[in-house]
Structures are given as C-alpha cells and as structure tokens.
Amino acid sequence: MIGIGLVCGAVALPILLTERALHIAPERRVTPDRAKAEEIAGLAGASWREAAISSADGAALKGWVFLPASERESGKAVILLHGAGDSRKGMLGFARFFAQHGYAALVVDSRGHGVSAGPRVTYGLLEKTDMTRWADYLLSLKPGARLYGLGMSMGASILIQALDNEKRFRSVVAECPYATFRAAASERIPRLTGLPAAFASPIIGAAFLYARLRYGYDLDAVSPVESLRRTHTPVLLIHGLADDRTDPGQSRELHAANPANSELWEVPGAKHVQASVVAQREFEERVMRWFEK
C-alpha cells in the first residue's frame, strides 16, 4: 500500500504543480480597481480609458491606457507588464511615473490574470504574440510614437521573448526575469513542495511532459535567454541581490547571452521586483536614461 501511495503521489504531484502554474484560480486573481485608475490619472494629470484587444487565439485581453496632456507632443509610449499572480493594478505606480513624463502608458492584465481571459498562463509561449496585439493597439492611439516596454518578473520575461517578433520596441527594461522557465521552476519547486532540490529535475520533467501531452505546450521553448541572444533591441536588466524568488544569476545569464545589447544593474538589498522601492530615485533615473538615450 505504501508503494502504491508513493507511485500515485509521484504521478499526481507534477500534474498538480502544472495545473497550478497554468491556471490562476479565481480567488488568487487580483481584480483591477477603476477608482484607483481615476486616482492615478488625476495625480498624473492624464486622461485614461479602458483598453481591450483579442489575442491571436481569441482570448479577450483587458487593460487601461493613460494619456498625458502632452502626449501628442511627446510621441512616447510604454507597455507595462506585471508578474505572475498580479494584475495591471500592480503597475499603476509606474503608469503614473511615465504619464507624468509625457508617455502614453498602457497597463494590461496578462492572459489568465485580472479580468483577461486565457484560459491558461503560458509564461511567454502565447503572451509574446499578445504583446504585438497590444503594441498595435497602443500605436493606433499614437501613430509614429517611440515604443518602449517595462516588465516585472514574468512580465519582464514575456517582454524579452516578445522581441523575437516585435521589432517596434526601441528598448525594454526587465526587472527580475528568468532565463528559462525550466530554471524558474527549478528554483520554485523546493519552496512549493518542501522537497529537496534534487527532486526538482524529475518533477519538472514529468510536469513538462504533462503540459505537452495535455495542452500541447512546449515549456522548454519558454526561453528568454535565447530571445535576448538574438535581439538587437537594447534591454536593461535589473535584479535585486536579495531576491529569494528568482536568483540574480538568471539575469547574469541573460546579460552574458548578449552583452552588446544589454546592461545589468544589480541592486543591493532589493528583494523580488523591489528595486524601485529600495533605490527609487536611481531606478527612475536609470530607466529614463535607458529609454531616452
């Protein structure tokens, strides 16, 4: 009986972990707050509106766009993308900052997050093509604008992967991205399961096989490092040295893949996606220099 239980557990655990990763349960979704959007627009001296597109596979994706009073003169636009389990709400502080500096700022709910449909989160496999649809939308509001991107964690990794096909980005800022989804999973499984790190590899192998057989997803193709290796778009990598969710070594690997077109800023004392909290002024100055150079 013990042996049967172990076998069942060995089969069930990768399936459970895969389903949890691919589906953000309704109770875990962060719902956008229109009142907060109104507040941010007022503080930034901007107008705002609902944004909506359909993805290539028919998913209804939602967001907000903030248009500053100077947007016609500035000709600058930025797409802001949150991390896993968050929503556009988590990027509103950045929207305010960019709107105050004359950028049209688009904050979106990534597929499977907030109120965007999905139905599944794929960590870049499908999301990278969503970025092209969002770029089309934003540039339809601001024809000829210079387009930029800023993402956090999963959002950072999606933006890097989007550079495979989306050539209109002038530059991108990516905080705490993963080099590959396999590497990200390897770091998280011991924390999620309490199992020793040595168990991560076989669990990931089984989980990735399940994702391929059940949904047709090749999660090994989620590889920001390969996208960065190929791109000519400048990418500023930011990583907190106290990050306990995504090891700073992942950003180092990304930078090493294409040092000619990337720069790495490591922030002492900053935890996961907390660089703008620990070093706010320097964060803002570096990002603006990166976009405007």
Which stretches of residues belong to each language-model region?
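An N-terminal hydrophobic leader/cap segment in hydrolases
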Residues: 2-54
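The serine-hydrolase catalytic nucleophile loop
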Residues: 84-97, 110
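Conserved alpha/beta-hydrolase
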Residues: 97-117
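Alpha/beta-hydrolase active-site loop
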Residues: 121-142
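Hydrolase active-site cap/lid region
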Residues: 161-217, 226
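Short beta-strand/loop motif that positions the catalytic acidic residue
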Residues: 230-232, 237-239, 243
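Conserved alpha/beta-hydrolase "acid-adjacent" motif
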Residues: 244-250
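Catalytic histidine-centered segment of alpha/beta-hydrolase-like enzymes
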Residues: 270-284
